[in-house]
């Protein structure tokens, strides 16, 4: 049997009991859990450069450890020079052990690599317990070799939980180590 990821063990041993005490759950199935992490990256210049899509697929595979699916345009949009069926991005959905391992690497290795990092904002909850984090550069991940990157792109990372409210989801992600900064706690940027 494979080893249990560190964060999954932390969830079972520390976070679940803490959430049960904090929110007064009676049934153990009521305790919120992280269901999946979706990592999405748009590739805008595919019409001119097929290599951009190949590089995005390879970088996403290195970052997540899983081969991404290519997302295609649902309809043509002339102003963006996009035709129906044209590849527009790549997406990976992580679950179970890979999800916890990615979350661990994101929090402990990647996020601290961001310049002037003070924490992630707590404003990106959707009202149903899911949290979305936008990252500006893929080079914060240690798996990406900066010398081989042609174009710096960002990505969206969505943490899908089965929590009923944003407060429960906030407590869950905070317990797993997400470095949140509460509104008003941000230090002003120095000029």
UniProtKB/Swiss-Prot annotation:
GO biological process: translation
UniProt cross-references to SUPFAM superfamilies, sorted A to Z: RL5-like
Gene3D superfamilies assigned to the protein according to its UniProt record, in alphabetical order: 3.30.1440.10
Keywords for the protein's UniProt record, in alphabetical order: Ribonucleoprotein, Ribosomal protein, RNA-binding, rRNA-binding, tRNA-binding
InterPro entries cross-referenced by the UniProt entry: Ribosomal_uL5 (IPR002132), Ribosomal_uL5_bac-type (IPR020930), Ribosomal_uL5_C (IPR031309), Ribosomal_uL5_dom_sf (IPR022803), Ribosomal_uL5_N (IPR031310)
One Pfam family per UniProt: Ribosomal_L5
Keyword match Ribosomal protein: yes
Superkingdom of origin: Bacteria
Cellular component aspect of the GO annotation: ribonucleoprotein complex; ribosome
Gene Ontology MF terms in the entry: rRNA binding; structural constituent of ribosome; tRNA binding
Family statement drawn from the similarity comment of this UniProt entry: Belongs to the universal ribosomal protein uL5 family.
Subunit structure, as described in the record: Part of the 50S ribosomal subunit; part of the 5S rRNA/L5/L18/L25 subcomplex. Contacts the 5S rRNA and the P site tRNA. Forms a bridge to the 30S subunit in the 70S ribosome.
Function text: This is one of the proteins that bind and probably mediate the attachment of the 5S RNA into the large ribosomal subunit, where it forms part of the central protuberance. In the 70S ribosome it contacts protein S13 of the 30S subunit (bridge B1b), connecting the 2 subunits; this bridge is implicated in subunit movement. Contacts the P site tRNA; the 5S rRNA and some of its associated proteins might help stabilize positioning of ribosome-bound tRNAs.
Protein name: Large ribosomal subunit protein uL5
Organism: Salinibacter ruber (strain DSM 13855 / M31)
Underlying gene: rplE
